[in-house]
Amino acid sequence: MDSRTTTAAEVAEQYGLAPLPVEGGMFRRTWAGPPDAGGRPAGSAIMVLLTDADGDFSALHRLPVDEVWHFYRGDPLELLLLHPDGSDRLLRLGTPLGHPQYVVEAGTWMGARVAAGGRWALFGTTMAPGFLPADYEGADPDDLCARHPRHAARIRALCRPGAPRSMPDTDGEGTRA
């Protein structure tokens, strides 16, 4: 499956992807481990599709659990990471010459979009323990721009003005990794 010959719509149909609320992109939860006494799955995994369309990106957010990002197909992703210690990193996930997999540590602000010149990217994320909608914390762009001024333009581009900063729990299973 090549991004030059396969369309994002074909990818979404092939894998049964649906819109990912708040964060953005199309996704499907592919696995959730057995729940603990509090209802949290032992682990969880999702597939996500992002495209080069305006407004299609993984909005800046953070999670209380490490999240492993896996590149599957298509064009590379540009992943912005703003760490709790004040450091930051702009990472390329996927080919050519990018990371095929990357662990984003708990508490790190993260957001992603298809790298310039790309059409779409199919990737996955895995968490253990698994995702619950209450884990998702959307970014306050003004706060992050003040703390990371050199990335202000990227931060604003990876935030949706007026969007909720929490993830709805609409299906009882959670809506992410």
Regions found by a protein language model. Name each.
Residues M1-Y102, G111-A112, G118-W120, T125, ...:
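Non-catalytic, conserved peripheral segments adjacent to functional cores
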Residues G107-T108:
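Extracellular beta-helix/beta-solenoid repeat scaffolds
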